Amino acid sequence: MDPNIARLGEWVGAAKRIVFFGGAGVSTESGIPDFRSTGGLYNQQYKYPPEVIVSHTFYEERPEEFFAFYRKRMLFPAARPNAAHRKLAEWERQGRLAAVVTQNIDGLHQAAGSRNVLELHGSVHRNYCEHCGKAFPLSYILQSTGVPRCDACGGPVRPDVVLYEEALDSDILEAAVEDIAAADLLIIGGTSLVVYPAAGLIRYFQGRHLVLVNKTATAADSRADLVIHDAIGAVFAQLP
């Protein structure tokens, strides 16, 4: 075993309150593309850049085009949890992991069995009518065409995800800050730490060990006590 992975395993074994903070790289091994990696959504060619399409302005002005892109490129109903999701759920069941803070919207942490999941950017599994507030599952979006319409009032149904130009949920952000501040081991995985305010959360960590697991270097590597440049699922599969 890689000595860095072995060291991480030792720290996990000794930790009383682990918090995991993850991004798109956590789900790439489940077949969901990362926005920023080579081959990710930002490097694929569209009429508009993906960050424009998944913006509040684009959603309001071109909802048909938004949903065409959203269904094709943002929804992966066949995706299943990988080794990283499963290991985190296992640690939570053992009482070692306090929370998962995620930038992902795919719901794979919950599918693996995690309960305390703070979804900074919302979830594709929650959708609601903008007029009457009625809730709808992911299947409703997948089975509809064009702009999904509420079966109760006819209003537009939108996903409960944070689009560009929209603010994060303040309650979820506050809970994430509290969990990170109370952690003795913070593991950051599968994120390039460039999207704010989410990336700024690590400054609240005051615990013993900060670990970064990411395929490529991040701006926070120098702050970490341990850095592992590898796929997170491959790393977590080797942990106790």
Report the location of each language-model feature:
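Conserved catalytic core of sirtuin-type NAD+-dependent deacylases
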Residues: 1-240
